[in-house]
């Protein structure tokens, strides 16, 4: 668990910070907050990596990472006087399930081309549901901290 896990975590965080920075640039984020977007993308992906490494499935790990991204984004928005979405949207994009969605789409095309088979339908449904649950976990996890931290009325 020692050095190889730490190296894999560092590599995962750096490789997740690159697309977070790229999407922040596409979204025209102010220059002074670009490093924070990259850092938050790396931290969120690193938390998801560690949660998956220690046995959590990818849907719940994505949910946990999205909650952390939302909390940190709200905190940084107060310090840097920017909207929380400036930090959080670009940071959560590297966690979107591209491979699962692509595999589901390819399975749909193969079903359309080759006809129905139970194996193709199983692959399509498995990957479609996995991608849907991850996207749902990311969107709900990203919105929960705002609901918790900006609530004006008591919960009960």
Swiss-Prot record:
Parts of the chain that traverse the membrane: 7-27, 54-74, 86-106, 128-148
InterPro entries tied to this protein: ThrE_2, ThrE_Dicarb/AminoAcid_Exp, YjjB
GO cellular component: plasma membrane
Keyword DNA repair: no
One GO term (biological process): succinate transport
Top-rank taxon, per record: Bacteria
Signal peptide: none
Alphabetized UniProt keyword annotations: Cell inner membrane, Cell membrane, Membrane, Transmembrane, Transmembrane helix, Transport
Localization annotation: Cell inner membrane
Topology with respect to the bilayer: Multi-pass membrane protein
Function: Involved in succinate export with YjjP. Both proteins are required for export.
Family designation: Belongs to the ThrE exporter (TC 2.A.79) family.
Description of how the protein assembles with itself and partners: The transporter is composed of YjjB and YjjP.
Name used for this protein in its record: Probable succinate transporter subunit YjjB
Organism listed in the record: Pectobacterium atrosepticum (strain SCRI 1043 / ATCC BAA-672) (Erwinia carotovora subsp. atroseptica)
Gene name of the encoded protein: yjjB
